[in-house]
């Protein structure tokens, strides 16, 4: 598929992202995307910054997993440290969703931090149901403030490694 480029006489190949397809249709269970394709699909500099900060702070590499979960099916990116899940990220067009599970050990501290977080993160936290003294937060990372809030929540789960 081709689309007209910015120059009056130049055509350029349309990427999968330009087509406007859902992530789980673009990359099926047998067709894992590369990290470059993930970045192209998200098409937001916050993704590269988030990924870099998590990798650096925890000295980890993400891995991809295919989910059939009805909430967010398709390929996702998982970050784990010492067997503990830090977060799972779901690529979206123009942003990404970060799933952070606030466990029973982190819940009180997270509640104390909430007034310092964005109104959006506070609302998601407040509206999330608590089960087994856990809250599952699906946070749409669309701006830097939300990204920083997500990183602070991850840090509650596992303290980052000092440089």
Question: Residues of each region from the PLM?
Answer:
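Charge-dense, helix-prone N-terminal extensions
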Residues: 4-163
């Amino acid at each position: 598929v081709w689309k007209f480029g910015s120059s009056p006489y130049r055509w350029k190949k349309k990427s999968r992202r330009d087509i406007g397809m859902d992530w789980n249709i673009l990359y099926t269970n047998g067709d894992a995307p590369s990290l470059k394709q993930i970045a192209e699909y998200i098409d937001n500099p916050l993704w590269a910054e988030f990924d870099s900060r998590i990798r650096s702070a925890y000295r980890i590499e993400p891995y991809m997993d295919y989910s059939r979960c009805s909430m967010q099916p398709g390929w996702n990116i998982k970050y784990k440290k010492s067997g503990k899940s830090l977060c799972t990220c779901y690529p979206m067009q123009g942003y990404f969703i970060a799933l952070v599970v606030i466990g029973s050990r982190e819940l009180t501290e997270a509640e104390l931090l909430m007034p310092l977080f964005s109104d959006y993160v506070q609302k998601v936290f407040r509206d999330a149901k608590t089960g087994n003294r856990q809250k599952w937060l699906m946070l749409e990372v669309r701006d830097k403030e939300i990204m920083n809030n997500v990183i602070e929540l991850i840090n509650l789960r596992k303290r980052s490694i000092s440089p």
